[in-house]
C-alpha cells in the first residue's frame, strides 16, 4: 500500500470491539467485574441479533452481540464455527464515502454497505492480512436520541456532552 498524507486519510477512530456471545446475560457479569457499565441493549434493525454496548473506563466501548432465538444469521453461523469470541473491530469514520474510496483505491475489499436512519456501515472483508473483520461506521446525530445517557455516547469522534 502507498503512503497517504493526512489530507488523503479520512478522520477515523476505534469505536468499539464486538464480541460474539451466545447470551449477553451470561457474559455480562465478567464485563461488570472488569468495571464496564452497560449503556444500551437493543435489537438490530434486521431482527437477527441483539447488541449491548458497555463503557469501559472513560471512553472505551465493548459490544456484546447475541443471536435472537429461532433466527439463523451470520451470528449463529459464526458461533457454530468459532464459538464465542472476538467478532469485529469497529472504526468510526467521519466520512463513509471517503473512507471506502481510500480503502478501495488501495485494493482493499469493502463489502455490505448499509445505510440506516441513525448510521451507515460497511465492512472490510476478513480476507485481509490481519484476518480481522473491520466494521466502518458513520453515525448520524439521531443515533443518540432515545438512548439512556446519550451524553456518554460519541458522534463524530466527540462526546455528545462536549
Q: Over which residues does each language-model region extend?
A:
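Long, hydrophobic N-terminal alpha-helical segment
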Residues: 2, 7-57
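Vicinal oxygen chelate
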Residues: 2-8, 21-29, 33-34, 52-57, 62, 81-162
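Short, structured motif recognition centered on aromatic/hydrophobic residues
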Residues: 14-21, 30-31, 54, 59-65, ...
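Short, tandemly repeated low-complexity microdomains enriched for cysteine and small residues
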Residues: 41-44, 74-80, 115-117, 145-148
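A low-complexity, Ser/Thr/Gly/Pro-enriched, surface-exposed linker/loop concept
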Residues: 69-73
Amino acid at each position: 500500500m502507498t503512503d497517504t498524507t493526512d489530507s488523503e486519510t479520512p478522520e477515523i477512530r476505534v469505536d468499539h470491539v464486538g464480541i460474539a456471545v451466545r447470551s449477553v446475560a451470561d457474559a455480562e457479569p465478567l464485563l461488570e467485574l472488569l468495571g464496564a457499565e452497560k449503556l444500551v441493549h437493543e435489537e438490530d434493525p434486521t431482527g437477527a441479533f441483539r447488541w449491548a454496548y458497555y463503557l469501559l473506563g472513560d471512553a472505551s466501548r465493548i459490544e456484546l452481540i447475541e443471536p435472537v432465538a429461532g433466527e439463523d444469521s451470520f451470528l449463529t453461523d459464526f458461533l457454530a464455527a468459532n464459538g464465542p469470541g472476538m467478532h469485529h473491530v469497529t472504526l468510526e469514520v467521519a466520512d463513509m464515502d471517503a473512507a471506502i474510496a481510500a480503502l478501495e483505491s488501495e485494493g482493499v475489499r469493502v463489502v455490505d454497505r448499509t445505510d440506516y436512519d441513525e448510521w451507515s456501515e460497511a465492512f472490510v472483508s476478513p480476507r485481509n492480512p490481519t484476518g480481522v473483520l473491520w466494521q466502518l461506521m458513520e453515525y448520524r446525530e439521531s443515533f443518540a436520541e432515545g438512548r439512556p445517557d446519550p451524553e456518554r455516547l460519541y458522534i463524530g469522534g466527540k462526546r455528545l456532552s462536549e
